[in-house]
Amino acid sequence: LWHTPNLYLNSKQEKVGKLLGDGYDYLAYFCNSGAEANEAALKLARKATGREKIISFKDSFHGRTFGAMTATGQESIQAGFGSLVPHFSYLTYNYLPDLEQLDETVAAVILELVQGEGGVLPAEKVWIKALSAICHEKGILVIVDEVQTGMGRTGTFYAFEQYPLLPDIVT
């Protein structure tokens, strides 16, 4: 995709935005990078829910800006930069018992449906189904980071289309 400043209407951007949300009740926000998209998703989740806590997963990768780096579940990426953004916790990917930690204090869960830096590890459908149900029940937003898996790279336009999941926010 391409990007021009959001200061004025761009007809091509408008057309692409509509295509990206085609078939879903989604709006598009254009930005410069995957990290910026994830930062916007985290801010939107906190603003929309009024909650601060964000859940991510060990061995995930969401970017190198402060919020996205904090969401990244890898100490090697986070080391050396001082204090991270508060109110982030990390669960074990594809591990059903950890989902019991999701409660009404959580604003959002951010995840990749295929963890690239975690070893090219796809999410298990039973785990996604449970995660989705718990999040829906407790008012937790689901953010799917499609920066590496979207645009047809996994066989469907969005990777989430292969799972029993309709995310609230897609990056």
Regions found by a protein language model. Name each.
Residues L1-T171:
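Conserved N-terminal phosphate-binding loop of PLP-dependent enzymes in the Aspartate aminotransferase
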